[in-house]
Amino acid sequence: MSGEALDEIQWKSPEFIQERGLHTGNVLEYFSLSPFYDRTSNNQQLMMQFQFQQIQIPVNTTFQQFFQEKLREMTGVVFVIAYNREPDFWIIRKQLQLDPQNAVTLQDYYIIGANVYQAPKVYDVLSSRLLSSVLQLRNSIDLLNKMTQFHVSDGGHSYNNAIHQSTSNPTQGQSSGKSISATVGNTGTTATPMTMQTPQTVGPNGPATVQSGANSAAAISKNGSTSSAESADDRKNIYLDDIPLYGRGSTVEMLGLKVNLES
């Protein structure tokens, strides 16, 4: 356990808790069993003295209070109870006692339930937070670099890489172009301009529709020529037949007119 970092481990003694429990009166003794304890401290020396000497504790004073008062009278490294909140929380402070009124804090430890931890230093906390922030920032910058590409047509770096997919992947671009061309060739329709060779025929229900394509144009041209010939024949039959002006079957008879031929 000596090779491990003390701020990365936790320690507890279930045997001590089961036998004696844990309270403010014995919490320093419980802490002295942990690897965080310094056996060269004044606590260890004072405990050895109390073990082999008869100590007269003043009236209305607990052993823990008397022990803490004796520690303040000594100079050197000591462990004291800095804060307690029974029954499950204590803060043990390691400090350099200069005199009964002055001390320099060296390290804090806290006990939660039966577990003992070493409190991290401010330097370690800030280093960990800054390292985490820098790592996240680096990942974000790498992601932004992957999202942008340099294109001469854009005049610099651009986030719109969709329009440059054909440039980055020529094979895919060619295949896409072929598929688009095939689709347009199969489904696209355009209006055919009216010429003398492809006349537009007018039927009783409205103008006829002119379709594009070589086959359709040829069919329309053929049908247009046939229709033109039939129309010419009809006009010839209508206007060139010999219809008498007077007499049976004449225009005057069909219109029901009376004409005075003697005048």
Swiss-Prot record:
Q: Does the keyword Transcription apply?
A: yes
Ranges of biased composition (kind: Low complexity): 182-202
Q: List the subcellular locations.
A: Nucleus
Superkingdom of the source species? Eukaryota
- Give any single GO term for biological process: regulation of transcription by RNA polymerase II
Q: Which GO terms describe its cellular component?
A: mediator complex
- InterPro entries to which the protein is assigned, alphabetical: Mediator_Med6, Mediator_Med6_fun, Mediator_Med6_sf
List where Polar residues composition bias occurs. 163-181
Listed A to Z, the keywords are: Activator, Nucleus, Transcription, Transcription regulation
Annotated region (Disordered) at 163-232
User: Which cysteine residues pair off into disulfide bonds?
Assistant: none
- Which is an annotated GO molecular function term of this record? transcription coregulator activity
What PANTHER family does UniProt report for this protein, alphabetically? MED-6-RELATED (PTHR13104)
Q: Relate the protein's function as given in its record.
A: Component of the Mediator complex, a coactivator involved in the regulated transcription of nearly all RNA polymerase II-dependent genes. Mediator functions as a bridge to convey information from gene-specific regulatory proteins to the basal RNA polymerase II transcription machinery. Mediator is recruited to promoters by direct interactions with regulatory proteins and serves as a scaffold for the assembly of a functional preinitiation complex with RNA polymerase II and the general transcription factors.
Family membership, please give it.
Belongs to the Mediator complex subunit 6 family.
The protein's name in its UniProt record = Mediator of RNA polymerase II transcription subunit 6
